[in-house]
């Protein structure tokens, strides 16, 4: 007897408000890509405005992950700092409604 288990990603359960917002975005044809060198260079206010008020498909391209920066509040440096800043950016995009993109450039 062979047993096979398949693990798949569960579909998101969206609230009625989230579904309504996604439908509203279908009525706008346009997109915006905000590009900056470091994770802390983004203008979250602009990204949120374009994504939520204008209903544009909005993204932020961070050329680096911020692993070359300074960390005044913790011991993380280099790659570990890049991991923290990456998670911060992903959390910010969940709040402001934009998409997050990265390049492979080193800081």
Residue ranges and their predicted role:
Residues 9-107:
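Active-site rim/loop-helix segments in enzyme catalytic domains that contact anionic ligands
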């Amino acid at each position: 007897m062979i047993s096979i288990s398949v693990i798949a990603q569960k579909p998101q359960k969206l609230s009625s408000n989230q579904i309504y917002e996604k439908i509203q975005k279908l009525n706008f044809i346009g997109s915006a890509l905000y590009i900056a060198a470091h994770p802390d260079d983004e203008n979250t206010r602009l990204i949120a405005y374009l994504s939520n008020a204008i209903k544009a498909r909005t993204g932020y391209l961070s050329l680096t992950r911020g692993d070359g920066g300074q960390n005044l509040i913790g011991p993380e440096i280099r790659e570990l700092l890049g991991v923290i800043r990456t998670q911060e950016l992903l959390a910010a995009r969940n709040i402001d409604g934009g998409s997050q993109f990265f390049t492979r450039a080193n800081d």
